[in-house]
Amino acid sequence: MPHRSLVCFAAPADKKAFMELVKTLRYRTEAPISDCSAALKETDGDMDAAMQVLRKRGAARAMKKGDRVTEHGFVVSCVGSTPASGAAIVTICSETDFAARNEHFQKVCVQARDQLCKLMDATNGAVLANPEEAVKHLSDVMAEELRVAIAVLGENMRVRSIAPLVPAPHMSERLLIGSYTHGSLNVDNVGRIVGLVALSQVRENEVVPKDVLTSVGRHFVATSGAEGNYAHQNFFGSETETVGKWLKQRGLKFSSSLVQEFGKEPVVHTAPEPHR
């Protein structure tokens, strides 16, 4: 009796079994159904071999799409586990807004956030000293995730930039970091605009609620285009309290802020050195 491989499925039972293999391969790789089917036929139903075929094809597609223009995407807030680890805003790009709103793209954004936070913690923030090198490092770490997403979405994707939050040198003790994300798609720390703030505690070991830090980040997002002394601005949502007064009442001093809107230059404020 002649040998019958998966290439030659004819009986209904065989077809059903083949489709189960296709379903499993798609679940594992997130590749299109047509690609999964072709890879399984090419490898006579060998799941591991089919996965290798898909990886090679995905890598080839990623290389072909690597030079295509990426003008859409989101910014991602990355805050280390301690203030010493630092904080930064990562910009992740795709070719179209449609792809940027896809769950696979947003998954890459979350992976980028987690990977950069790990690097920041492992290096005590030193990875942020050279933002361009940090982009290369993160891109290398994310190479497999980017390749898979490019293969699934059919569009180029890349880590465009990393903007670090730099505290004022004379106000680097007892630091706290706050983050606020605007225009998110129900994905934590991923949105159209991110605001980061570094604040110094006046009283050591005092617990500062997270929502206080978030409120300061929200203020700088809302007023990022404003000119003049930020300390004398009305705090966002208040008609009577200035930023300086609002912070003082909560035992905090402003050190620096960073606001990044996708596609625009970052806006930075840094506390001036006191007059001697």
Swiss-Prot record:
Localization annotation: Mitochondrion
GO cellular component: a single term: mitochondrion
UniProt xrefs under InterPro entries: EF-Ts_dimer_sf, Transl_elong_EFTs/EF1B, Transl_elong_EFTs/EF1B_dimer, UBA-like_sf
GO function terms (MF aspect): translation elongation factor activity
GO BP terms: mitochondrial translational elongation
Main localization of the protein described in the UniProt heading: mitochondrion
Keywords, ordered alphabetically: Elongation factor, Mitochondrion, Protein biosynthesis
The UniProt record lists the keyword Transferase: no
Domain of life: Eukaryota
Keyword Protein biosynthesis on entry: yes
Similarity comment: Belongs to the EF-Ts family.
Function field: Associates with the EF-Tu.GDP complex and induces the exchange of GDP to GTP. It remains bound to the aminoacyl-tRNA.EF-Tu.GTP complex up to the GTP hydrolysis stage on the ribosome.
Note: This protein may be expected to contain an N-terminal transit peptide but none has been predicted.
Name assigned to this protein: Elongation factor Ts, mitochondrial
Organism: Leishmania infantum
